[in-house]
């Protein structure tokens, strides 16, 4: 677990902040993040991929990825969850998890089915029923942060290449 926290610290330490004198914009951003946090921590949270939303917004200002990375919109993760008929007792593996959108959606829905975030089953879902693998180091850090924000603790995420035989 410490390796994942070290990776998060290293990757996010590279973020450079622009100096601004617009305190209102900063205050609005802080209020917005607080509002998102309140939604994520409620029993009524719908499993939005918060880090995916941030990632897509930030990437609008960067060159297109040469690696062909595509991040799945929320309506597609919801559709896929229903299509494969996941239940609270299933195990979910996303072998190219990106920002963790499918895992976040599955976790949210499975926990809802189990009685909410305070149910005994919720801890089991987070600890042993969700697995994610991501090759790209920075995207892996994004998935770890996303699962951490959603109270998973990034327990079963691994930075590996699922295309290799190792």
Annotate each language-model stretch with its function.
Residues 41-85:
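S-adenosyl-L-methionine
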Residues 66-165:
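Conserved S-adenosyl-L-methionine
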Residues 1-60:
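Long recognition/docking surfaces used for binding and targeting
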């Amino acid at each position: 677990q410490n390796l994942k926290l070290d990776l998060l610290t290293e990757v996010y330490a590279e973020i450079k902040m622009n100096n601004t004198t617009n305190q209102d914009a900063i205050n609005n951003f802080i209020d917005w993040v607080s509002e998102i946090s309140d939604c994520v921590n409620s029993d009524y949270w719908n499993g939005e991929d918060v880090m995916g939303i941030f990632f897509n917004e930030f990437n609008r200002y960067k060159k297109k990825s040469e690696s062909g990375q595509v991040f799945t919109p929320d309506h597609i993760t919801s559709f896929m969850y229903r299509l494969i008929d996941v239940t609270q007792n299933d195990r979910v593996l996303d072998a190219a998890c990106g920002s963790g959108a499918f895992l976040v959606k599955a976790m949210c829905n499975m926990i809802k089915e189990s009685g909410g975030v305070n149910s005994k089953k919720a801890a089991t879902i987070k600890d042993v029923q969700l697995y994610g693998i991501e090759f790209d180091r920075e995207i892996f850090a994004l998935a770890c942060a996303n699962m951490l924000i959603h109270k998973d603790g990034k327990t079963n995420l691994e930075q590996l290449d699922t295309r290799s035989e190792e």
